[in-house]
Amino acid sequence: MVNFNSAVNILEVVQVSPPSSNSLTLPLTYFDLGWLKLHPVDRVLFYHVPELTRSSLISKLKSSLSATLLHYLPLAGRLVWDSIKTKPSIVYSPDDKDAVYLTVAESNGDLSHLSGDEPRPATEFHSLVPELPVSDESARVLAVQVTFFPNQGFSLGVTAHHAVLDGKTTAMFLKAWAHNCKQEQEALPHDLVPSLDRIIVQDPTGLETKLLNRWISASNNKPSLKLFPSKIIGSDILRVTYRLTREDIKKLRERVETESHAKQLRLSTFVITYAYVITCMVKMRGGDPTRFVCVGFASDFRSRLNPPLPPTFFGNCIVGSGDFDVKAEPILEEGEGKGFITAVETLTGWVNGLCPENIEKNMLLPFEAFKRMEPGRQMISVAGSTRLGIYGSDFGWGKPVKVEIVTIDKDASVSLSESGDGSGGVEVGVCLKKDDVERFGSLFSIGLE
């Protein structure tokens, strides 16, 4: 029987330090500063391992985490910003006993229910991820929670400061930790060893200073790492996962190729999937066709820079794109998938604009746009990616049966990830009220017929 009132009991909180006596100071780049005051990204990975004991689980995870932090020293440190004359930096000091806080918990909940696709209260996931302490002058970088489900398995909750890690760095760290735990060795494959070089990120236009000035202005003209307040999530918000198979994506792609007259469209899995989700979201809301919708996404820029950054570059290297004033009317248009095709064509234009010359414009635009945006405007954005390979995080007990980005309930995001079964499909996560879940689900299904 599904337990919808599951309790999570905190058993202990331990500090896990890397076996290193070296100190480290790593300044933030403008790629990091764009996300400075946004809420952390919370992920939870579910593992079905009925025969596992709590003592063996915690012992292996603690020792392998310590070994992994030797390569990922910044994650054991703190984000510090104590003077208006300096910029924020990540500081790790063994003398200050810097460490990652690992929470050990136990739940009487139903792991299969939590890791399913069906509607589940979004608040059920909040107790599976740890808090990240933040003050004006200091913020923890990473916190981890292991929740043991007796005779079922465990969940691994990871809370990461958005100004320190993007999705690619988070996925790289998780796969490195999993590798160390499974192989019981400290050596990592080359593609899981992070590059901490900051000199390679050039700032010819002074974008760092412009971003810092805007954050200082937003904090009563003083440096502050305190985050923007997060939306309070009620019990009426449900988390649901929808799936597009490889065949679904192929059919949607063929529909665009047949019906669109535009040339050189971007028909990647991301564009097809996100365009389809945008269409369903806008039609779900309905309303005045002359209304505007805010639509955005972020792209990895490591390979787009000249010269490019290494694929293993540690930190943020993502830039947002989109439009705060997308007209709903063309997307609401009925007949032959016209709204979906409009969304594909719109996304194509934004993807084509992903170039180094547009970085500053794209990173500064939100500061002005949010000031003039009226309350209640529909917002659609993306968390995650189908290219992160997050389901490859095998700690020795098999791959996760489900991965959820918990924080999509705070900011109207949808989450995208590769299908956990390796079939080439896409998992789409949404958090909506019950009536909206029913409308969105109906639109999602009908559009694939």
Swiss-Prot record:
The modification N-acetylmethionine is found at M1. It holds the Pfam family Transferase. It catalyses: anthocyanin A3 + malonyl-CoA = anthocyanin A5 + CoA; anthocyanin A7 + malonyl-CoA = anthocyanin A9 + CoA; anthocyanin A6 + malonyl-CoA = anthocyanin A8 + CoA; anthocyanin A10 + malonyl-CoA = anthocyanin A11 + CoA. This is Malonyl-CoA:anthocyanidin 5-O-glucoside-6''-O-malonyltransferase. Optimum pH is 6.0-7.5. The keyword Transferase applies. Transmembrane segments: none annotated. SUPFAM superfamilies: CoA-dependent acyltransferases. Disruption phenotype: Absence of malonylated anthocyanins. Belongs to the plant acyltransferase family. Keywords: Acetylation, Acyltransferase, Transferase. Its EC number is 2.3.1.-. InterPro entries: CAT-like_dom_sf, Plant_metabolite_acyltrans. Expressed in flowers. Detected in leaves, stems, roots and siliques. Gene3D superfamilies: Chloramphenicol acetyltransferase-like domain. GO terms for biological process: anthocyanin-containing compound biosynthetic process. The glycosylation of the coumaroyl group in anthocyanins A6 and A10 likely occurs after malonylation of the 5-glucoside by 5MaT, which could explain why this enzyme is more active on anthocyanins A3 and A7 than on A6 and A10. GO terms for molecular function: cyanidin 3-O-[2''-O-(xylosyl)-6''-O-(p-coumaroyl) glucoside] 5-O-glucoside malonyltransferase activity; O-malonyltransferase activity. The active site is at H162 (proton acceptor), D394 (proton acceptor). Induction: Up-regulated by high sucrose and by low phosphate stresses. Catalyzes the malonylation of the 5-O-glucose residue of anthocyanins, using malonyl-CoA as the malonyl donor. Acts only on anthocyanin substrates containing a 5-O-glucosyl moiety. Acts on the four native A.thaliana anthocyanins, A3, A7, and to a lesser extent, A6 and A10. Can also use the non-native anthocyanin compounds cyanin (cyanidin 3,5-diglucoside), malvin, pelargonidin 3,5-diglucoside, peonidin 3,5-diglucoside, cyanidin 3-coumaroylglucoside 5-glucoside, delphinidin 3-coumaroylrutinoside 5-glucoside and petunidin 3-coumaroylrutinoside 5-glucoside as substrates. The keyword Acyltransferase applies.
